[in-house]
Amino acid sequence: MQILEEKPKEGKVKVKAETLDDLWHLYHIIDPGDIVYAKTLRKQAQRADSLRAEKVEVIPVFLGVQAEKINFHKFANQVRVTGPIVYASREDVPLGKYHTIAIEQGTVVTIQKPRWKEHHIERLKEAVAASKRARVMIVVIDDGEADMALVREYGVEILNSIRHNLGGKRYNTDRESEEMKFFHDVAKTMEEVMKRENVEKAIVAGPGFVKEDFYKFLKEKYPELAKKVVIEDTSVTGRTGIYEVIKRGVVDRVYQENRVAKEVQLVEKVLENIARNNGLVAYGLKEVEEAVNYGAVETLLVLDELLKGELREKVEELMDAVRYSRGEVVVVSSEHEGGEKLKALGGLAALLRFRVK
């Protein structure tokens, strides 16, 4: 994401959304009541004379819409902001009528807030920093099967699954030929995805020796791709293997600033502390609020959905209190396994400096 202009006195920030991740950030930055300005298309009835029917035209116009509904449409690659029009660049567009602004990759949008809160500013900074980082690709590979995923800012996107029937014994000539075809398919797919998505690193993992064989193959046949590959172990294959790579901190080691890896690891730490019953964790609104009041929270985990729901104001108060006591606040995406686990805990959890009970 690019910040094009800032007007602090007016509470306005003008940005350009460049990636799907930027749309995810904007979905969490824009709140009900904010005014969103952008170029858009609007159907407008054009008056005709008494002999001809009224004609509807689609006109380009610059509008300001006061947000009432904000929806993230991942598969359409859009954030849709719906609300009454409060500003229009054309006099023939009536104010007060409802309109939906569709924010896509490449859209320039101005967001005006009565007050920019700390978590809004943090997410905006994150989005700008993330635009300078490459994403990470994960490939979990074993005999004749490879599962691929991209680790994005908003979560894990499962990509291609490649399956080849390699036949019988490991050192059979036909099997070796089929394995070479399989390796070529995986390598070509990796090249395509990494080029398209601007990925600098790929983690190739798996439970057996196939990953090492594949890496040797890459060094011989695809040397440039091999330079971007890191080899790791997993205990399983498939999607479970992909999430194992993330949980074990492999992504974090490969690309330390990756948001998803940090979120998943923190949720896992919460679950570990719960299992140990060591008193250094709180979860659910009541427990977390008590820990915040004691100044005991070292890290507060907040599910992103709570910042769009009825508890938003209460949760924001807790976030501000934790920051005031020099704690860390991490907003966890609901789009990955860690977010699902946090949701099961009520959407709020805290790692504590000391026991409060």
Curated annotation (Swiss-Prot):
* Gene3D superfamilies per record: 3.30.1330.30, eRF1 domain 2, Pelota, domain A
Q: Is Ion transport among this UniProt entry's keywords?
A: no
GO molecular function terms listed in the Swiss-Prot or TrEMBL record: endonuclease activity; metal ion binding
* Known cofactor(s): a divalent metal cation
A single Gene Ontology CC term: cytoplasm
Q: Which Pfam families match?
A: eRF1_1, eRF1_2, eRF1_3
Q: What EC identifiers does the entry list?
A: 3.1.-.-
Keywords from the UniProt entry: Cytoplasm, Endonuclease, Hydrolase, Metal-binding, Nuclease
Keyword DNA damage among record annotations: no
Q: Where in the cell is it found?
A: Cytoplasm
| Single Gene Ontology BP annotation | nuclear-transcribed mRNA catabolic process, no-go decay
**What's the domain remark here?**
The N-terminal domain has the RNA-binding Sm fold. It harbors the endoribonuclease activity.
By sequence similarity, the record places it as follows:
Belongs to the eukaryotic release factor 1 family. Pelota subfamily.
In terms of NCBIfam families, this protein maps to:
pelota
Self-association or partners: how does it assemble?
Monomer.
Cite the HAMAP family for this sequence. Answer: PelO
Q: What is the stated purpose of this protein? A: May function in recognizing stalled ribosomes, interact with stem-loop structures in stalled mRNA molecules, and effect endonucleolytic cleavage of the mRNA. May play a role in the release non-functional ribosomes and degradation of damaged mRNAs. Has endoribonuclease activity.
Q: Under what name is this protein listed?
A: Protein pelota homolog
Give the organism's phylogenetic lineage.
Answer: Archaea, Methanobacteriati, Methanobacteriota, Thermococci, Thermococcales
